Protein backbone atom coordinates (compact mmCIF):
# COMPACT_ATOMS: atom_id res chain seq x y z
CA UNK A 1 0.00 0.00 0.00
CA UNK A 2 1.30 3.44 -0.94
CA UNK A 3 2.35 5.53 2.03
CA UNK A 4 0.98 9.06 1.86
CA UNK A 5 2.82 12.06 3.22
CA UNK A 6 0.89 14.47 5.40
CA UNK A 7 -0.13 17.82 3.84
CA UNK A 8 1.46 20.84 5.50
CA UNK A 9 1.16 24.61 5.76
CA UNK A 10 4.09 26.91 6.53
CA UNK A 11 3.99 30.58 7.48
CA UNK A 12 6.72 32.96 6.34
CA UNK A 13 7.88 35.77 8.64
CA UNK A 14 8.86 38.59 6.27
CA UNK A 15 10.78 40.32 9.05
CA UNK A 16 13.16 37.42 9.60
CA UNK A 17 12.66 35.40 6.42
CA UNK A 18 12.09 32.31 8.60
CA UNK A 19 9.50 29.69 7.68
CA UNK A 20 7.48 27.80 10.27
CA UNK A 21 7.42 23.98 10.20
CA UNK A 22 10.73 23.91 8.31
CA UNK A 23 12.49 20.55 8.31
CA UNK A 24 15.94 22.11 7.89
CA UNK A 25 17.91 25.34 7.64
CA UNK A 26 21.42 26.60 6.95
CA UNK A 27 23.30 29.88 7.10
CA UNK A 28 26.15 31.42 5.13
CA UNK A 29 28.27 33.88 7.07
CA UNK A 30 30.44 36.52 5.45
CA UNK A 31 33.58 34.42 5.98
CA UNK A 32 31.98 31.55 4.03
CA UNK A 33 31.79 33.70 0.90
CA UNK A 34 35.53 34.17 0.41
CA UNK A 35 36.47 33.93 -3.26
CA UNK A 36 33.10 35.00 -4.64
CA UNK A 37 33.91 38.68 -5.14
CA UNK A 38 36.34 40.43 -7.48
CA UNK A 39 37.72 42.90 -4.93
CA UNK A 40 39.63 40.62 -2.57
CA UNK A 41 41.16 43.59 -0.73
CA UNK A 42 37.70 45.00 0.03
CA UNK A 43 36.53 41.58 1.21
CA UNK A 44 39.52 41.25 3.54
CA UNK A 45 38.95 44.75 4.95
CA UNK A 46 35.28 43.96 5.64
CA UNK A 47 36.06 40.77 7.55
CA UNK A 48 36.97 42.68 10.69
CA UNK A 49 33.36 43.81 11.15
CA UNK A 50 31.45 41.35 8.98
CA UNK A 51 33.23 38.03 9.50
CA UNK A 52 30.54 36.31 11.61
CA UNK A 53 27.56 38.13 10.09
CA UNK A 54 24.97 35.87 8.45
CA UNK A 55 24.72 37.23 4.90
CA UNK A 56 22.00 34.83 3.86
CA UNK A 57 20.06 31.95 5.34
CA UNK A 58 17.72 29.30 4.04
CA UNK A 59 14.75 27.59 5.71
CA UNK A 60 13.32 24.62 3.84
CA UNK A 61 10.60 21.98 3.91
CA UNK A 62 12.06 18.75 2.53
CA UNK A 63 9.65 15.79 2.81
CA UNK A 64 12.05 13.53 0.88
CA UNK A 65 14.41 13.59 -2.10
CA UNK A 66 12.53 11.24 -4.40
CA UNK A 67 11.17 11.97 -7.85
CA UNK A 68 7.58 13.16 -7.80
CA UNK A 69 7.80 15.37 -4.72
CA UNK A 70 8.78 18.99 -4.08
CA UNK A 71 11.19 20.85 -1.83
CA UNK A 72 10.32 24.43 -0.95
CA UNK A 73 11.55 27.11 1.40
CA UNK A 74 12.71 30.68 1.85
CA UNK A 75 15.95 32.58 1.40
CA UNK A 76 16.66 35.76 3.38
CA UNK A 77 19.59 37.86 2.21
CA UNK A 78 21.12 41.02 3.65
CA UNK A 79 21.75 44.11 1.51
CA UNK A 80 25.35 45.11 0.97
CA UNK A 81 28.34 45.27 -1.36
CA UNK A 82 31.95 44.13 -1.45
CA UNK A 83 33.64 47.04 -3.15
CA UNK A 84 31.06 47.93 -5.77
CA UNK A 85 29.78 44.36 -6.20
CA UNK A 86 26.41 43.49 -4.69
CA UNK A 87 26.00 40.61 -2.25
CA UNK A 88 25.35 37.27 -3.96
CA UNK A 89 24.56 33.69 -3.01
CA UNK A 90 27.01 30.94 -3.96
CA UNK A 91 24.76 29.80 -6.78
CA UNK A 92 24.39 26.36 -8.36
CA UNK A 93 23.08 24.22 -11.16
CA UNK A 94 20.87 21.30 -10.24
CA UNK A 95 22.71 17.99 -10.02
CA UNK A 96 19.84 16.61 -12.10
CA UNK A 97 20.28 19.50 -14.48
CA UNK A 98 17.00 19.04 -16.34
CA UNK A 99 15.09 20.12 -13.23
CA UNK A 100 13.57 23.65 -13.11
CA UNK A 101 12.97 25.95 -10.15
CA UNK A 102 10.57 28.72 -9.19
CA UNK A 103 11.42 31.76 -7.04
CA UNK A 104 8.81 34.15 -5.67
CA UNK A 105 9.96 37.54 -4.42
CA UNK A 106 8.31 38.43 -1.13
CA UNK A 107 10.33 41.42 0.06
CA UNK A 108 13.11 43.61 -1.28
CA UNK A 109 14.69 44.00 -4.70
CA UNK A 110 16.94 41.45 -6.30
CA UNK A 111 18.11 39.77 -9.46
CA UNK A 112 18.45 36.19 -10.58
CA UNK A 113 21.71 35.87 -12.50
CA UNK A 114 21.58 32.91 -14.88
CA UNK A 115 24.21 31.30 -17.09
CA UNK A 116 23.94 28.44 -19.56
CA UNK A 117 26.66 25.75 -19.64
CA UNK A 118 28.01 27.44 -22.80
CA UNK A 119 28.18 30.83 -21.07
CA UNK A 120 25.04 32.63 -22.26
CA UNK A 121 23.85 35.12 -19.64
CA UNK A 122 20.34 36.09 -18.61
CA UNK A 123 19.27 38.42 -15.78
CA UNK A 124 15.75 38.38 -14.32
CA UNK A 125 14.47 40.93 -11.80
CA UNK A 126 12.96 39.62 -8.57
CA UNK A 127 10.95 42.22 -6.70
CA UNK A 128 8.13 41.71 -4.21
CA UNK A 129 5.26 39.71 -5.77
CA UNK A 130 7.42 38.66 -8.72
CA UNK A 131 7.64 35.04 -9.85
CA UNK A 132 10.95 34.03 -11.46
CA UNK A 133 11.14 30.84 -13.54
CA UNK A 134 14.56 29.17 -13.75
CA UNK A 135 14.37 26.68 -16.64
CA UNK A 136 16.25 23.37 -16.70
CA UNK A 137 20.03 23.46 -17.34
CA UNK A 138 20.61 27.04 -16.15
CA UNK A 139 23.21 27.85 -13.50
CA UNK A 140 21.72 30.49 -11.21
CA UNK A 141 22.54 32.72 -8.26
CA UNK A 142 20.62 35.43 -6.40
CA UNK A 143 21.78 39.04 -6.05
CA UNK A 144 20.44 41.61 -3.59
CA UNK A 145 20.56 44.99 -5.34
CA UNK A 146 18.27 46.79 -2.89
CA UNK A 147 18.68 48.66 0.36
CA UNK A 148 16.73 46.15 2.47
CA UNK A 149 16.67 42.42 3.01
CA UNK A 150 15.71 40.26 0.04
CA UNK A 151 13.25 37.49 0.96
CA UNK A 152 12.31 34.88 -1.63
CA UNK A 153 10.34 31.66 -1.63
CA UNK A 154 11.73 28.84 -3.79
CA UNK A 155 10.37 25.50 -4.99
CA UNK A 156 12.00 22.73 -7.03
CA UNK A 157 11.63 18.97 -7.69
CA UNK A 158 12.77 16.94 -4.71
CA UNK A 159 15.33 14.90 -6.66
CA UNK A 160 17.08 17.96 -8.19
CA UNK A 161 20.16 18.16 -5.96
CA UNK A 162 22.69 21.01 -6.20
CA UNK A 163 26.09 21.28 -7.86
CA UNK A 164 28.02 24.28 -6.52
CA UNK A 165 31.42 23.34 -7.96
CA UNK A 166 30.48 24.12 -11.57
CA UNK A 167 30.74 27.85 -10.81
CA UNK A 168 34.04 27.65 -8.94
CA UNK A 169 35.64 25.49 -11.65
CA UNK A 170 34.82 28.17 -14.24
CA UNK A 171 36.33 30.96 -12.13
CA UNK A 172 32.91 32.25 -11.13
CA UNK A 173 29.95 33.25 -13.25
CA UNK A 174 30.57 35.04 -16.52
CA UNK A 175 29.36 38.44 -15.31
CA UNK A 176 29.26 40.31 -12.02
CA UNK A 177 26.54 42.67 -10.83
CA UNK A 178 27.92 45.99 -9.60
CA UNK A 179 26.72 49.44 -8.55
CA UNK A 180 26.48 51.70 -11.60
CA UNK A 181 27.14 54.82 -9.53
CA UNK A 182 23.74 56.25 -10.39
CA UNK A 183 21.53 54.39 -7.94
CA UNK A 184 21.20 51.30 -10.08
CA UNK A 185 23.18 48.30 -11.22
CA UNK A 186 25.06 47.08 -14.25
CA UNK A 187 26.69 43.86 -15.37
CA UNK A 188 30.43 43.71 -15.97
CA UNK A 189 32.56 40.90 -17.34
CA UNK A 190 34.26 38.61 -14.86
CA UNK A 191 37.91 38.56 -15.93
CA UNK A 192 38.45 35.27 -14.07
CA UNK A 193 35.73 33.38 -15.96
CA UNK A 194 36.87 30.44 -18.10
CA UNK A 195 34.86 28.97 -20.94
CA UNK A 196 33.89 25.35 -20.32
CA UNK A 197 35.20 22.67 -22.66
CA UNK A 198 32.91 20.39 -24.65
CA UNK A 199 33.15 17.50 -22.17
CA UNK A 200 32.21 19.71 -19.23
CA UNK A 201 29.28 21.19 -21.13
CA UNK A 202 28.04 17.71 -22.05
CA UNK A 203 28.30 16.63 -18.41
CA UNK A 204 26.26 19.64 -17.25
CA UNK A 205 23.55 18.70 -19.73
CA UNK A 206 23.65 15.12 -18.43
CA UNK A 207 24.59 13.79 -21.87
CA UNK A 208 27.23 11.43 -20.47
CA UNK A 209 24.64 9.72 -18.28
CA UNK A 210 22.27 9.36 -21.22
CA UNK A 211 25.00 7.83 -23.43
CA UNK A 212 26.00 5.32 -20.73
CA UNK A 213 22.40 4.25 -20.19
CA UNK A 214 21.67 3.92 -23.92
From Swiss-Prot:
Binding site for Fe cation: 92, 94, 101, 140
UniProt catalytic activity: alpha-D-glucose 6-phosphate = beta-D-fructose 6-phosphate
Keyword entries, A-Z: Cytoplasm, Gluconeogenesis, Glycolysis, Iron, Isomerase, Metal-binding
Pathway info: Carbohydrate degradation; glycolysis; D-glyceraldehyde 3-phosphate and glycerone phosphate from D-glucose: step 2/4
Main location class: cytoplasm
Localization per Swiss-Prot or TrEMBL: Cytoplasm
InterPro entries the record matches: G6P_isomerase_archaea/bacteria (IPR016758), G6P_isomerase_prok (IPR010551), RmlC-like_jellyroll (IPR014710), RmlC_Cupin_sf (IPR011051)
Keyword Iron attributed: yes
First-level EC class: isomerase
Sections of the chain in a coiled coil: none
Transmembrane segments: none
GO MF, any single term: glucose-6-phosphate isomerase activity
GO BP field: gluconeogenesis; glycolytic process
A GO cellular-component term linked to this record: cytoplasm
Source organism superkingdom: Bacteria
EC number in record: 5.3.1.9
Pfam families per UniProt: GPI
The family this protein is said to belong to: Belongs to the archaeal-type GPI family.
Quaternary data: Homodimer.
Protein name, UniProt field: Glucose-6-phosphate isomerase
Protein encoded by which gene: pgiA
